[in-house]
Amino acid sequence: MISTGLPLFTLSKICHNCFFKQTRSLSRYSSKDKVKGRRRLLPRPNTEKFNSARSGVGVGVGNGAGAGARVGVGAGAGSVAAKVFESGNFSQLHNNGLSKQAQTAGLDLKQKITSFDQLKVFPSVREAMIKEIKSQYNLKGPQHSSIDDVVIKPTPVQIAAIRKINQTRKIKVAKNLDEMSEGERIQIELQTKNEEQKTKIFTVAAETGSGKTWAYLANIMSKLKEDDYKWFNQSPEAYNSFKSSEQVRSVILLPTHELVEQVYETLKRANSFLLEYENVPLQYKEFLNLPEHHTLGLSIAKLSHGDAPINVYKQLRNRGKIDILITTPGKITSFSKLESIDRPFKIFKSIRYCVIDEADTLFDDSFLKDTTAVVKNFPKLLDLILVSATIPKEFEKTLLRLFPDQKSLIRVATPSLHKISKNIKVMTLDADLAPYNGSKTRCLAQAIYAISKDGTEHNHVKRIIIFVNEKAEVDGLVDLLQSKYHIRREDICGISGSVNVGDRKDYLEPFLKPAQLLEDDVDQSKIKILVTTDLLARGMNFIGIKNVILMGLPKSSVELVHRLGRTGRMNQLGRVFIIVDKKSRKSWVKGLGSAIMKGSRIG
């Protein structure tokens, strides 16, 4: 249990008064906004307390409209938030044209699509996908007594991506071939072949926690299965020869080994379920009755930390083709060091589908050279899918430079891109106020204490993620919370770039699965705390995390979006506490919570 060095009654009384003072002080903020020559007073802020009736401890909510409630696109010219989010170093997100991209992404029909059965997904992929999503569903609360009661519906990004990416290639067939000369027929055939083999480039951008992983997995897995089905229809011999061919068919590139492991585990789970094939179209029945299709039957491989590139060759030699390889760009470039293999990149010559996840990271200066060099080794590439939760301005510039013909880019963006889910409640805590008197760690300890006593997540281990800006801060904060505030060693860990990948995996395990029942936790923990940096702010699917704490503001709006997105995922509720002091306090921070509730876009 956490100790702050004060008796419980005294602590509760002090903190109640302190946080009430913080929230009350917000009412002194007002902002005048010029609208067509007239002045309009922004609404007064809302003030709340963080389950204080149950815990006896109040955590202040800084959701006032104040100086910065109008955040991002559409903010008034006179608002502080508009200046902060749309100019200067903090503002790094590209928002121009997003509404148009969402309109052209097929989302105008999203209200009519309520089931994956309405989307073009291969039958075995659809069933395995739904089973995998259900297996990771955070089943807490009274809504559902059993996972069988949960109906899995496609999210907006899944609808848009599947409708766009999984379209049949439109190839115009000339009607008057008989009337053409031999030369004209050859020209038409070449044009048709070029259209069939042309690389299509998709960008898929959607808010954090919206289901982007399955938005691209459903597409590439369906395409792989459709290709299998075509070989099967040719002849049994052709199909068996294809299965045993030593080739990699698709690749998923990610920036970190943690993300490689995460996507690999998702695919491994999907590949393990026995499939029942209800309501399968007649044309697929014979194909799906083959013994290898009792499960998804895909050959999956990963190259992560500790995995030698030579292992890929061994798997190809022993088991034939690899359907999906999950790795980092750096791992593929390391194939050039395989002196024992003649032409080591030849196994990638048959790759038809490539996903670049967290594309804004893999296209920044530190990764761009490796990423582009890797993709150049895929001469038969049909679909290149770039996936991201944010479109930073620099990423957009890189796309324009790499693909100057914008017609070659097929863009998919959801209406909520760069918006924070309304399921996330954002609260600000000012560490300069009494009783903290400038101590952000004491303010942090109080927030942890309040969360531990708030009565939520009944009978489950509560999990908290704390973000700091520098990796040098991680170990010091962990040590301080242990030594001064008596948090048990078993209940807290720190992860930064200096922690080896093996230890990271062990530390992350409690946060990457649904919350455990108190009685099942081997450490007898009531709370688990992870202290980290932006290393784990991107893409990590922290399942059912309800509480995130930011020790100050991140360095940019991009990092802010990703940190807030570690909670409130897949329509679940979450809370974020931002601890500020005079060094990091910005006038717009206290308005961030209400701006999120208004659906404002972060700029």
Curated annotation (Swiss-Prot):
Domain (Helicase ATP-binding) ranges: 193-409
Enzyme class, first EC level, given as a word: hydrolase
Major location (coarse): mitochondrion
Protein family (similarity comment): Belongs to the DEAD box helicase family. MRH4 subfamily.
Catalytic activity: ATP + H2O = ADP + phosphate + H(+)
Domain-related comment: The Q motif is unique to and characteristic of the DEAD box family of RNA helicases and controls ATP binding and hydrolysis.
Top-level taxon of the source organism: Eukaryota
PANTHER family: RNA HELICASE
InterPro entries: DEAD/DEAH_box_helicase_dom, Helicase_ATP-bd, Helicase_C-like, P-loop_NTPase
Organism, scientific name: Lodderomyces elongisporus (strain ATCC 11503 / CBS 2605 / JCM 1781 / NBRC 1676 / NRRL YB-4239) (Yeast)
Annotated GO CC locations: mitochondrion
Pfam families: DEAD (PF00270), Helicase_C (PF00271)
Gene behind this protein: MRH4
Signal peptide (UniProt feature, chain positions): none
Record's protein name: ATP-dependent RNA helicase MRH4, mitochondrial
